[in-house]
From Swiss-Prot:
<dbReference type="GO" id="GO:0005737">
    <property type="term" value="C:cytoplasm"/>
</dbReference>
<feature type="compositionally biased region" description="Gly residues">
    <location>
        <begin position="502"/>
        <end position="515"/>
    </location>
</feature>
<keyword id="KW-0053">Apoptosis</keyword>
<keyword id="KW-0539">Nucleus</keyword>
<keyword id="KW-0963">Cytoplasm</keyword>
<feature type="compositionally biased region" description="Low complexity">
    <location>
        <begin position="460"/>
        <end position="471"/>
    </location>
</feature>
<comment type="subunit">
    <text>Monomer.</text>
</comment>
<comment type="function">
    <text>Antiapoptotic factor that may have a role in protein assembly.</text>
</comment>
<dbReference type="InterPro" id="IPR008383">
    <property type="entry name" value="API5"/>
</dbReference>
<dbReference type="InterPro" id="IPR016024">
    <property type="entry name" value="ARM-type_fold"/>
</dbReference>
<feature type="region of interest" description="Disordered">
    <location>
        <begin position="446"/>
        <end position="523"/>
    </location>
</feature>
<dbReference type="GO" id="GO:0017134">
    <property type="term" value="F:fibroblast growth factor binding"/>
</dbReference>
<keyword id="KW-0677">Repeat</keyword>
<comment type="similarity">
    <text>Belongs to the API5 family.</text>
</comment>
<dbReference type="GO" id="GO:0043066">
    <property type="term" value="P:negative regulation of apoptotic process"/>
</dbReference>
<dbReference type="Pfam" id="PF05918">
    <property type="entry name" value="API5"/>
</dbReference>
<dbReference type="InterPro" id="IPR011989">
    <property type="entry name" value="ARM-like"/>
</dbReference>
């Protein structure tokens, strides 16, 4: 084993030789042997090996392996020095291997070491992005779970920081192709991270790019398979995938496939849905997703059939008025409970799809069915007015901090919900029914309307649907707080899939626990 003095002497030989250093193979071999010495010798070797690496291509494997030994040394300072120098080995055909090595080193629990690995990866990204990605994806597909997890997180956080000259169209196409391979076997959390990665790529910001992403999500959601409402993982997967798809939909990227699936398979089983998430109102979550998607539904093959399913589900939440006794009082003794949050979602979805078949209520329903529906609408609208008056009275004069209490937040949400329902009911009371009004769903941020877009959820309410609306509360009072959820109960928060992690148990097609890939060091 060489001493410190021998290492310095051989370093001098190579340094003095400059461009002819390659002729002094023996001197470089002495430096390589320095990794077998003590701490001082190893520190010198960690610096000297990469400095002259380019002059000895025939010793490339030996040099890289020697540096790797130092990357695994027990002395943290030696490890850090060796890792810091790794990018100097990333030349030509060696770069993917160095990227692979650095990806494996992401499993380090030493924060300074971990940061060095991140910086080293970013530096070789700028040399050859595609080659670096090859190393990262190699470990994501075949590496140990901890390496896979950290490699995915590296991509999800660091890719967006790279300049356009690094993330070229060719590089982005490579990311998409490799991501598709990974998506064949992912957990729920990994899927969310990959959607974050892919949706951030410039080449996928186009209409065709968004359409590709929607198709990827649809494949993950397994929309061709039979829906099992009693399987929490099946339900959870559908909701998580749908939640990823919703931001991708637009007037040019349609939600038809998802809306059709929800109408045909999910709505009929709404009451049977199960979820592994404690405290989640799974039925409301499904209805909210359907409402959000319904705005972007394109031409649907079985429109009338699916509109009928939606209509039937809406009727379940719009009760008939209770029968009155001879003295005019409620014979049953108890008023039916009005589920405003559910009705907002269902009525909005029906209103959106109804635009595509405007004669559904008049031509597709018999007269008795239409009469029954209008009775339900009128009864619901009466209850709505009572509730709206109570809410306005409770919120009257309250501004600023007073509106930020939990109780008042709930009331503000409730007022948005009831205003929305009222606007939609008024539309359906037109003869023939109208589908022209525009409302903003209660859990969505309020969009600034154009001057000509007068009929929105800011429309005020009336004592009966067909009559002129009375004055409502001040507009700014309702816009102070835009809560995430449309259910006005003590639970205001909208369920966040991004913060939940993966699915439980086996996945079938990729959802659940991944197979065992532990292989030890594979440098």
């Amino acid at each position: 084993m060489p001493t410190v003095e021998e290492l310095y002497r051989n370093y001098g030989i190579l340094a003095d030789a400059t461009e002819t250093a390659g002729q002094h193979k023996d001197a470089y071999q002495v430096i390589l042997d320095g990794v077998k010495g003590g701490a001082k010798e190893k520190r010198l070797a960690a610096q000297f090996i990469p400095k002259f690496f380019k002059h000895f291509p025939e010793l490339a494997d030996s040099a890289i392996n020697a540096q790797l030994d130092l990357c695994e040394d027990e002395d943290v300072s030696i490890r850090r020095q060796a890792i810091k120098e790794l990018p100097q080995f990333a030349t030509g055909d060696n770069l993917p291997r160095v990227a692979d090595i650095l990806t494996q080193l992401l499993q380090s629990d030493d924060s300074a070491e971990f940061n060095l690995v991140n910086n080293a990866l970013l530096s070789i990204f700028k040399m050859d992005a595609k080659g670096t990605l090859g190393g990262l994806f190699s470990q994501i597909l075949q590496g140990e779970d901890i390496v896979r997890e950290r490699a995915i997180k590296f991509l999800s956080t660091k890719l967006k920081t790279l300049p356009e000259e690094v993330l070229t169209k060719e590089v982005e196409e490579f990311i998409l192709a490799e991501s598709k391979k990974v998506l064949e076997d992912v957990t729920g959390e990994e899927f969310v991270l990959f959607m974050k990665i892919l949706s951030g790529l410039k080449s996928l910001q186009t209409v065709s790019g968004r359409q590709q992403l929607v198709e990827l999500v649809a494949e993950q959601a397994d929309l061709e398979q039979t829906f099992n409402p009693s399987d929490p993982d099946c339900v959870d997967r559908l909701l998580q995938c749908t939640r990823q798809a919703v931001p991708l939909f637009s007037k040019n990227v349609h939600s038809t496939k998802f809306v059709t699936y929800f109408c045909e398979h999910v709505l009929p089983n709404l009451s049977a849905l199960t979820t592994p998430v404690e405290g989640l109102d799974i039925q409301l979550e499904v209805l909210k997703l359907l409402a959000e998607m319904s705005s972007f539904c394109g031409d649907m093959e079985k429109l009338e059939s699916n509109l009928k399913k939606l209509f039937d589900k809406l009727l379940e939440y719009m009760p008939l008025p209770p029968e009155e006794a001879e003295n005019g009082e409620n014979a049953g003794g108890e008023e039916p409970k009005l589920q405003f949050s559910y009705v907002e979602c269902l009525l909005y979805s029906f209103h959106q799809l109804g635009r595509k078949l405007p004669d559904f209520l008049t031509a597709k329903l018999n007269a008795e069915k239409l009469k029954d529906f209008k009775i339900r609408l009128q009864y619901f609208a009466r209850g709505l007015q009572v509730y709206i008056r109570q809410l306005r009275l409770a919120l009257q004069g309250k501004t600023g901090e007073a509106l930020k209490t939990e109780e008042n937040k709930i009331k503000v949400v409730a007022l948005k919900i009831t205003n929305n329902i009222n606007v939609l009911i008024k539309d359906l009371f037109h003869i023939p029914p109208s589908y022209k009004s525009t409302v903003t769903l209660s859990w969505k941020p309020v969009q600034k309307a154009d001057a000509n877009q007068k009929r929105t959820s800011e429309d005020t309410t009336s004592s009966s649907p067909p009559k002129k609306a009375s004055a409502g509360p001040k507009r700014d009072a309702r816009q102070i707080y835009n809560p995430p959820s449309g259910k006005y109960s003590s639970n205001l928060g909208s369920f966040s899939y991004e913060q939940r992690g993966g699915f439980r148990g086996g996945r079938g097609r990729g959802w659940g626990g991944r197979g065992n890939r532990s292989r030890g060091r594979i440098y």
